[in-house]
Amino acid sequence: MAKKVVALIKLQVKAGQANPAPPVGPALGQRGLNIMEFCKAFNAATSKLEPGLPTPVIITAYSDRTFTFITKSTPASVLLKKAAGVSSGSKRPNTDKVGKVTRKQLEEIAKVKEADLTAAELEAAVRTIAGSARSMGLTVEG
């Protein structure tokens, strides 16, 4: 018989840097889950990623206090800011441009995000990422 799901917990944790401090500790602790077990498993799963990149994770908590988790790819906004070399997006993206990204950079980001995007082709994924870039106040070249 399948285990009963009691909660879905969505967090953004830095790759390879999960620890019992907030947001991980309180979110798992109130569900009675083993915090250190999650931290070790998450850090092992994200060891191939660049340390410190925010990584969305969806934790499924079961009634017997066990859990499973799925890691997603880093948010497009974080990858775009890194590619453009800016610390934050524009407060007024239509009038104030804060940086530039090239078509090649968009393609690289689209390849990283491919599994999480609903786009059927790479070209559609690139257009999606380009739209995100424009909404952040980045100029798309190429």
UniProtKB/Swiss-Prot annotation:
Pfam families assigned to the protein according to its UniProt record, in alphabetical order: Ribosomal_L11, Ribosomal_L11_N
Segments traversing the membrane: none
Keyword annotations from UniProtKB, A to Z: Methylation, Ribonucleoprotein, Ribosomal protein, RNA-binding, rRNA-binding
Domain of life, source organism: Bacteria
Any Gene Ontology biological process: translation
PROSITE patterns tied to this protein: RIBOSOMAL_L11
Function: Forms part of the ribosomal stalk which helps the ribosome interact with GTP-bound translation factors.
Protein name: Large ribosomal subunit protein uL11
Organism: Xanthomonas campestris pv. campestris (strain B100)
